[in-house]
From Swiss-Prot:
It comes from Haemophilus influenzae (strain ATCC 51907 / DSM 11121 / KW20 / Rd). Its EC number is 2.7.13.3. The lineage of its organism: Bacteria, Pseudomonadati, Pseudomonadota, Gammaproteobacteria, Pasteurellales. One of its GO terms (cellular component) is plasma membrane. It comes from the Bacteria. It is found in: Cell inner membrane. Keywords: ATP-binding, Cell inner membrane, Cell membrane, Kinase, Membrane, Nucleotide-binding, Phosphoprotein, Transferase, Transmembrane, Transmembrane helix, Two-component regulatory system. This is Sensor protein NarQ homolog. Residues 1-13, 173-567 are cytoplasmic. Pfam families: HAMP (PF00672), HATPase_c (PF02518), HisKA_3 (PF07730), PilJ (PF13675). PANTHER family: NITRATE/NITRITE SENSOR PROTEIN NARX-RELATED (PTHR24421), NITRATE_NITRITE SENSOR PROTEIN NARQ (PTHR24421:SF10). It catalyses: ATP + protein L-histidine = ADP + protein N-phospho-L-histidine. Residues 175-228 form the HAMP domain. GO terms for biological process: signal transduction.
Length: 567
């Protein structure tokens, strides 16, 4: 992406300029160095011109025949390519060129004297000619030195220029790239630490770093706004969760108070007071129908505020009214609705519980009345008959009447003792059913209460479910078991009594009382004894079957067979 004032473009331009300068300087240095290639040869050749000119003078005097050969050599040296190359260089100084032309002109005259073997004129001009050659050699050496100095100067200037340009590029890069990136790094670390108001970045620059700074600043600003919104949302959710938790806690505490205690005006007052405080209510009132003494009011009603009302009802049965006025902060309407439902259910269950208690009380009274009628009423009827006979015999004074009277009194005492014993057993059974409704434990309690009356071993084995019988059925079963066990203790003359409760092959409940004694002779009861009849009557009320018979291995078995479904 092109950006006005691009840092990368400017750095690229600077580097390109440095490359161009380095290329130019390198080319110039190479040109200077290449121009020095013939300088040494030219200096050597020009220096040899002096020796050759003296040699020609000697040969003119001593060996005239070799002068022509040396002249050709001299001509070759004087017009050598090294000297011509130096003369043809575009930056050769004019002094050097004039000096070379002067040597050429003088050598024209000198060559003429040499060819004419004119030793006198040749030697006369030789001194000046050698002086000109020496001057040419001097100028040639100075020109070579100047070129080396120029080359070194150019290289030095180039190095200095490149160094300055590189320094500028470094300074520019540090100012335009490194420092902004360093600031941006600090800013990013601050953003990472949730400090969205980071150090200011230079967003005015129209380059890549300026664009990046603007984008980063905008991003951090948006992140800060987003974080603030998220923080507000989290705080709002946290507040709602706290409110929900407080609501659930309030409902839980209210439910605990209503479910774990017998509801009354004190419990209702505790629940309403808890709601009144926790939900910042200004006014709350509950009215219970049929129990006006339970009406509770907390706070003061404000006539200017709306009164909210919830009817306490279950299955369209209206039980009361809950009304309230909210304070600040306003409570969740659902908590008051749930509270109204809990209060309605609690009042409904309390009402049903009271009704069930009344029914149970009436049923218990009915059971007691029936038991008293089945046991004691027959004894009292027998006593009344005996008392009538006794009164009749007392009117007679003969000896036989007295004996009958004594027999009646004995029967009277026996019946009275038996009735008293039945009353104690009946009371023990009622206490047992009240204290323990579990069949197995109730059987054990009955048998344990009889252990003091005998030395026989008595074992209980109950395989029926613990809640197989309701309280009324349990009373009948326990009375039958007590009566059968008492008969075995009194009449069996055995050593072991087995009491078992199980489910037979047909799926019926069976309760067995077995002993290993002499066995029952028959099912006829003596006069004044009604135990077997009472057992049979109880079985009829249970819709059960009673079987009493002698066992083949000895002893008596009393078996009660009950249908599987009793309720």
């Amino acid at each position: 992406m092109y950006t006005k004032g691009s840092v990368s473009t400017r750095i690229a331009k600077y580097l390109f300029i440095i490359l161009i300068v380095a290329g130019v300087i390198s080319s110039l240095s190479l040109a200077i160095m290449s121009s020095n290639k013939y300088d040494a040869e030219a200096i050597n050749i020009s220096g040899s011109l002096r020796m050759q000119s003296y040699r020609l003078l000697y040969e003119m005097q001593e060996q005239p025949e070799s002068v022509e050969t040396n002249l050709r050599r001299y001509h070759i040296s004087l017009h050598s390519s090294a000297l011509l190359e130096v003369q043809n260089q575009f930056f050769t100084p004019n002094v050097l060129k004039h000096s070379y032309q002067n040597i050429l002109q003088r050598w024209t005259n000198m060559e003429k004297y040499a060819r004419q073997q004119d030793v006198k004129n040749y030697s006369k001009q030789l001194t000046d000619y050698v002086a000109d050659v020496d001057y040419f050699v001097f100028e040639l050496q100075r020109f070579s030195e100047q070129k080396w100095i120029l080359g070194v100067s150019v290289l030095g200037f180039a190095m200095l220029l490149i160094l300055l340009m590189v320094s500028y590029v470094i300074w520019y890069t540090n100012r335009e790239v490194v420092k902004p990136l360093h600031l941006m790094t600090k800013a990013s670390m601050q953003v990472q630490m949730r400090q969205f108001n980071h150090i200011p970045l230079d967003t005015r620059k129209q380059n890549e770093l300026g664009t990046l700074a603007r984008v980063f600043t905008q991003m951090s600003t948006e992140l800060g706004q987003l974080y603030s919104r998220l923080e507000e949302a989290v705080n709002e959710k946290t507040q709602k969760l706290r409110q929900t938790n407080r609501t659930l806690s309030t409902l839980y505490q209210s439910a605990q108070l209503l479910n774990t205690n017998t509801i009354n005006d004190k419990i209702l007052n505790q629940v309403l007071n808890y709601i009144f405080i926790s939900d910042h209510l200004n006014f709350v009132k509950v009215e219970v129908m049929g129990a006006e003494h339970w009406d509770i009011t907390l706070g003061k009603q404000d006539a200017n505020n709306e009164l909210q009302i919830e009817t306490l009802s279950v299955d369209n049965e209206e039980l009361g009214v809950l009304s309230w006025q909210a304070g600040l902060p306003c409570p969740d309407p659902r908590i008051m609705q749930n509270l109204a439902q809990m209060l309605a259910r609690a009042l409904y269950f309390h009402k049903n519980l009271r009704q069930k208690e009344q029914l149970l009380l009436m049923e218990e009274r009915s059971i007691i009345a029936r038991e008293l009628h089945d046991s004691l009423a027959q004894v009292l009827s027998f006593l009344q008959i005996q008392l009538t006979l006794l009164k009749h015999n007392l009117k007679k004074e003969d000896e036989q009447s007295k004996e009958k009277s004594l027999a009646i009194i004995a029967n009277f005492e026996q019946a009275l003792s038996g009735g008293y014993a039945q009353l104690r057993e009946l009371l023990a059974t009622f206490r047992l059913t009240i204290q323990e409704a579990n069949l197995q434990l109730a059987l054990k309690q009955v048998i344990d209460s009889l252990r003091s009356q005998t030395t026989m071993q008595m074992n209980v084995n109950c395989q029926l479910p613990s809640q197989s019988l309701n309280p009324q059925q349990l009373v009948h079963v326990l009375q039958i078991v007590r009566e059968a066990t008492t008969n075995a203790i009194k009449h069996s003359q055995g050593t072991v009594i087995e009491i078992s409760a199980r489910i037979n092959a047909e799926g019926e409940y069976e309760i067995l009382v077995e002993d290993d004694g002499v066995g029952i002779p028959n099912l006829e009861e003596p006069e004044g004894h009604y135990g077997l009849n009472i057992m049979a009557e109880r079985c009829r009320q249970l819709n059960a079957q009673l079987h009493i018979h002698r066992r083949e291995q000895g002893g008596t078995q009393v078996k009660i067979t009950l249908p599987h479904t009793l309720y």
